[in-house]
């Protein structure tokens, strides 16, 4: 396949830019960009738990879909923090119960089981990130 005329022009333009820039083709100035994940209400209701509890919930979610999420709902009642600070504790509790029910009911078609495992992984990731924040260690994920 022969390169088209447009491809040749693009390559020539890139070569001209690279020759004009002594640092190479890239002209980035080292700007730091911060990205924040926008979470839905169910995802934001996942509590920040201690690491061992999060691992137990992941284990439970792996073998009995929704059970770890159900257990994590009760950690909200015990004071676990979530990303929904403006919602009442009971509302966050019921959001977690709803997530557990969704996982249980859709486990029949494997969707709930996979969702349950990912939910447990999110619990562990949140527990790890919370541990880093408490210790003041810079975090790289």
From Swiss-Prot:
<feature type="transmembrane region" description="Helical">
    <location>
        <begin position="87"/>
        <end position="107"/>
    </location>
</feature>
<keyword id="KW-1133">Transmembrane helix</keyword>
<comment type="similarity">
    <text>Belongs to the SPEC3 family. Stum subfamily.</text>
</comment>
<keyword id="KW-0597">Phosphoprotein</keyword>
<protein>
    <recommendedName>
        <fullName>Protein stum homolog</fullName>
    </recommendedName>
</protein>
<feature type="transmembrane region" description="Helical">
    <location>
        <begin position="51"/>
        <end position="71"/>
    </location>
</feature>
<keyword id="KW-0472">Membrane</keyword>
<dbReference type="InterPro" id="IPR026673">
    <property type="entry name" value="SPEC3/Stum"/>
</dbReference>
<dbReference type="GO" id="GO:0016020">
    <property type="term" value="C:membrane"/>
</dbReference>
<feature type="modified residue" description="Phosphoserine">
    <location>
        <position position="26"/>
    </location>
</feature>
<keyword id="KW-0812">Transmembrane</keyword>
<dbReference type="Pfam" id="PF15795">
    <property type="entry name" value="Spec3"/>
</dbReference>
């Amino acid at each position: 396949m022969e390169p088209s005329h447009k491809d040749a022009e693009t390559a020539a333009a890139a070569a001209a830019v690279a020759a004009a820039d002594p640092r190479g083709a890239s002209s980035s100035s080292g700007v730091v960009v911060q990205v924040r994940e926008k979470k839905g209400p169910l995802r934001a209701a996942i509590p920040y738990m201690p690491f061992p509890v999060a691992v137990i919930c992941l284990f439970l979610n792996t073998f009995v879909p929704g059970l770890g999420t159900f257990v994590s709902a009760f950690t909200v009642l015990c004071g676990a923090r979530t990303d929904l600070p403006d919602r009442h504790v009971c509302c966050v509790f019921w959001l977690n119960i709803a997530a557990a029910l969704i996982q249980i009911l859709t486990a029949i078609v494997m969707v709930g089981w996979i969702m349950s495992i990912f939910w447990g992984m999110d619990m562990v990731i949140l527990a790890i990130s919370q541990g880093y924040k408490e210790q003041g260690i810079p975090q790289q994920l």
